[in-house]
């Protein structure tokens, strides 16, 4: 015999309001922001109905809980706007990659370093990748010297997040802005 389907109870998001508030007494703040002190829940509900608004629990952990008479829809909308604004202001840190060869020319090196400096100013991490081709693998010390030079040139604006290491035919190092 099958068990009957039982739906999971719906979890309400946001603060408790109106009949969901199950405490005998609350500290009440009305729509104008005036504190009415410690009142019974029935009295608070009556005042909220009289104003045509909702009784919303603002600070549930207080003793007694702090409730405010506000429009619940408006409160939820304002909270959503605040959350969206906070998400918009968050900066995601990207890892930008700069590719070089061990026998890079001085001007090319300077151009790459200017690009790295711009990335650090924008708050991004930089992954410096050195690619070895053919017989260049026999001279890995040149690559190590070049990465040490990059580290020394960016010491004021960046810190080394991962030291230079060889992976296959590539040597790489990650720098993060200070």
Swiss-Prot record:
Family annotation (NCBIfam families): infC
Example GO BP: ribosome disassembly
Subunit structure: Monomer.
Pfam families linked to this entry: IF3_C, IF3_N
UniProt KW keywords: Cytoplasm, Initiation factor, Protein biosynthesis
Transmembrane portions of the chain: none
Function description: IF-3 binds to the 30S ribosomal subunit and shifts the equilibrium between 70S ribosomes and their 50S and 30S subunits in favor of the free subunits, thus enhancing the availability of 30S subunits on which protein synthesis initiation begins.
Protein name: Translation initiation factor IF-3
Keyword Cytoplasm recorded: yes
Compartment list: Cytoplasm
Protein origin, superkingdom: Bacteria
Start and end residues of each stretch annotated as Disordered: 1-20
A cellular-component GO term for this protein: cytosol
Family label: Belongs to the IF-3 family.
GO function term, MF aspect, one: ribosome binding
